[in-house]
Swiss-Prot record:
Segment forming the signal sequence: 1-20
Residues modified by glycosylation: N138, N141, N338
Subcellular location(s) of the protein: Secreted
EC number(s) stated in the UniProt entry for this protein: 3.2.1.15
Xref: Gene3D superfamilies: Single-stranded right-handed beta-helix, Pectin lyase-like
Purpose: Involved in maceration and soft-rotting of plant tissue. Hydrolyzes the 1,4-alpha glycosidic bonds of de-esterified pectate in the smooth region of the plant cell wall.
Alphabetical keyword list: Cell wall biogenesis/degradation, Disulfide bond, Glycoprotein, Glycosidase, Hydrolase, Repeat, Secreted, Signal, Zymogen
UniProt catalytic activity: (1,4-alpha-D-galacturonosyl)n+m + H2O = (1,4-alpha-D-galacturonosyl)n + (1,4-alpha-D-galacturonosyl)m
Name assigned to this protein: Probable endopolygalacturonase B
Main subcellular location: secreted
InterPro entries: Glyco_hydro_28, Glycosyl_hydrlase_28, PbH1, Pectin_lyas_fold, Pectin_lyase_fold/virulence
């Protein structure tokens, strides 16, 4: 048995030391329980199962789960908390191959984002740490985490063959001052599956900026900006291909199903499917495709450098508020092609008079 503490690393046997184990971080036959970030950092490399027990992450530090040996299982236990500092984060970072990240019953990750929320998100005010960096977390699984009140962005995903299942991200306390609390931002990734997510937030529930073979299904999105592709363009990777967003609900959000591309940029959005999406209480657009984003804002002037082709909107149904627009399609000349439009019904709002270059078969 090994006991990891900031001032002691000992290997010994005896009943007296065994009795002291609850106060220490214990590793036995590859199973390790850590109660501090310093112990985790020094001991994680030798562990096949890591339990994180009531860890209080010091201000300005990352809970470092990078470089784990292949096949490691990480288990959050109790309540994980974070000290306050204005910095970029992330609060948690994980990488490795064939990693499983999960939690014990009753556990939660409480970011206490209200300490940072000022209504400005990432656009000014306090510098806010992002929550979870899942970069190079390949052939891995994140399952059942319950996350509360991220200061700003939630999961940043740049990985291959990563499955995220039954995750709760609850920023409902940030309705007034939370901003840019995106749940899942996906970029430069392949074979990503997000299944059964429950999200309460103030920005995109899902944003796919680049990547291929991505699935978001059985999701519930409340209070944010909806299910989004983009903005696509202006990055090092400007290709989105083979994305299926299905069997999901979008409630009390700005947008329902959205594709947005950057003004004057190049790239491609192909093989994207929105299927069986239920909308309720949408305040801006039920279905929206815009090719006019510049500096994060629409210009009303679409360009055609990003091709938006082989797109399916199927059974996107529900209601928007009376001040919202049911459907808005603003494409560049010749850039939106080969769309499938079937069984869509968005009602309750206004009909747009500003649609341009609507592809054959679609309605606006």
């Amino acid at each position: 048995m090994h006991f990891f503490q900031s001032s002691l690393v000992a290997a010994t046997m005896g009943a007296a030391l065994v009795a002291a184990a609850p106060a220490a971080d214990l590793e036995t036959r590859g199973s390790c329980t850590f109660t501090s970030t310093s112990a985790l950092k020094s001991g994680k490399a030798s562990c096949s199962t890591i339990t994180l027990q009531n860890i209080a992450v010091p201000a300005g530090e990352t809970l470092d789960l990078t470089g784990l040996k292949a096949g490691t299982t990480v288990v959050f236990d109790g309540t994980t908390t974070f000290g306050y500092k204005e910095w970029e984060g992330p609060l948690i970072s994980a990488s490795g191959t064939s990693i499983t990240i999960k939690q014990n019953p009753g556990a939660k990750i409480d970011c206490d984002g209200a300490r940072w929320w000022d209504g400005k998100g990432g656009n000014g005010g306090k510098k806010k740490p992002k929550f979870f960096s899942a970069h190079k977390l390949n052939k891995s699984n994140i399952t059942g985490l319950k996350v509360y009140n991220t200061p700003v962005h939630g999961f940043s995903i740049q990985s291959d063959h990563l499955t995220i299942k039954d995750v709760l991200l609850d920023n409902s306390a940030g309705t007034k001052l939370g901003h840019n609390t995106d749940a899942f931002d996906v970029g430069s990734s392949t074979y990503i599956t997000i299944d059964g997510a429950t999200v309460y937030n103030q920005d995109d529930c899902l944003a796919v900026n680049s990547g291929e073979h991505i699935t978001f299904t059985n999701g519930y999105c409340n209070g944010g900006h909806g299910l989004s592709i983009g903005s696509v363009g202006g990055r090092s990777n400007n290709v989105v291909n083979d994305v299926t967003i299905s069997n999901s609900q979008v409630i009390n959000s700005q947008n329902g199903a959205r594709i947005k591309t950057v003004y004057g940029a190049t790239g491609s959005v192909t093989g994207v499917k929105f299927q069986d999406i239920s909308l309720k209480g949408i305040t801006k657009y039920g279905i929206v495709v815009q090719q006019d984003y510049e500096n994060g804002k629409p210009t009303g002037k679409p360009t055609n450098g990003v091709k938006v082709s082989d797109i399916t909107f199927e059974k996107v149904t529900g209601t928007v508020t009376s001040s919202a627009t049911d459907i808005y399609i603003l494409c560049g000349s010749g850039s939106c092609t080969n769309w499938t439009w079937s069984g869509n019904s968005v009602t309750g709002g206004k009909k747009s008079s500003s649609c341009k270059n609507v592809p054959a078969g679609a309605s606006c």
